Amino acid sequence: MNVKVYNLDGSEKGDIELPAVFETEYRPDLIKRAVISSLTAKLQPKGCDAFAGYRTSAKSIGKGHGKARVRRTAQGAGAFVPQAVGGRRAHPPKVEKILFERINKKEKLKALASAIAASAIPEIVSARGHKIEGVPSLPLVVNAEFEGLVKTKEVLDVFKALNLAADVEKAKDGIKIKAGRAKLRGRKYKKPRSVLVVVGDACEAIAASRNLAGVDVITANDLSAIHIAPGTMAGRLTLWTENAIEKINGRF
């Protein structure tokens, strides 16, 4: 299957043959598993001190005194038990807990292929909430000169020429302050995702693009399901460079 390649000003440059991965069957179940696997891989095991709450000289006086048989200090205050001040936790976190959702290598690769194919289906992209009115084609492939851009304004001009700016504005308007403790822990804002830019190799356009609201930039070799289907929802609006298409063809 061939698609149009567009210049930085939005004009057509020519055609490019898409890799066979863009014709992969849509498997939302596999995509969900792969994304959850990537998310849980970031979790760190946690546990408590094995002797937390146990460092006390409190003793139980046994039965027959008309009071609960909890361990007590010399002053008569309860200790050691979960309901006592300074006592142990009832069910503390265990480092042995399995946090990571495992997935087979072939399943993970199949999920990525399915997510890539879903990004080329207008109905799925639109259902995800992206603004695709006026976007020339899906998948959207741009001239390799895009990777040489050094200014965010230059990238934004390309987005305007390809009618991607509306999706960036939608993401910018959707930035909200979170409720609760997250504000105090370095994750104050909820930021919607907009355009994903896939480039061939590390280039200047990475720094130029990532300052736009909701825009993520990734190289073709580092692309995974978590980038192209964030939140387990496939169909992210994606801008590919010519070099990225060639690299993807080599991965599958």
Swiss-Prot record:
Cross-referenced InterPro entries: Ribosomal_uL4, Ribosomal_uL4_dom_sf, Ribosomal_uL4_euk/arc_CS, Ribosomal_uL4_euk/arch, Ribosomall_uL4-arc
GO CC, any one term: ribonucleoprotein complex
Annotated GO MF terms: rRNA binding; structural constituent of ribosome
The keyword Ribonucleoprotein is annotated on this UniProt entry: yes
Biological processes annotated in GO: translation
Keyword Transferase assigned: no
Alphabetical list of Gene3D superfamilies matching this protein: 3.40.1370.10
Keywords: Ribonucleoprotein, Ribosomal protein, RNA-binding, rRNA-binding
PROSITE patterns assigned to the protein according to its UniProt record, in alphabetical order: RIBOSOMAL_L1E
Record text on subunit structure and interactions: Part of the 50S ribosomal subunit.
NCBIfam families: rpl4p_arch
Similarity comment: Belongs to the universal ribosomal protein uL4 family.
Biological function: One of the primary rRNA binding proteins, this protein initially binds near the 5'-end of the 23S rRNA. It is important during the early stages of 50S assembly. It makes multiple contacts with different domains of the 23S rRNA in the assembled 50S subunit and ribosome.
Designated name of the protein: Large ribosomal subunit protein uL4
